Amino acid sequence: MTRPLPAWRSLLFVPVLSERFLAKAHTRGADAIILDLEDSIIPANKEAARKALPAAVPRVAQNGADVVVRINRPLELAVPDIAASVMPGVAALMLPKVMGPEHVRLLAELVTAREATLGMAVGHTRFLVLIEGPAALPHLYAIAAEPRMAGMSV
């Protein structure tokens, strides 16, 4: 995975179940649009949000923005999020609340398996990592070493 990193200057969060935001997201001029499966989606609507992704991805990308999907942190939610999110039109997954490299490696294995199942190039899906607590700070270098890494927010 030696391809160049994306040049994302502006990223726009869009709740994947919000028709109002989906309808206009592609007109806002963002370099990347983040379809949110995490905080903007209540637990009862998580599955509906996953099912909405195949229609939402090309819709928000129609003016050339890259598409990123923010998945949930708990593994029981992250696994179905990955199954729904990894597809040719999704450039990256945003991984929230990362605490260490082990979690990132595990998610990378799941993404690799999903890409292979879909016949996609392994490594197509990049990672944007969100460091949201101090426990991860000693592990930043190891987290950043993940080959799928496109960016990190601390």
Residue map of PLM features:
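Conserved alpha/beta-domain cores
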Residues: 2-154
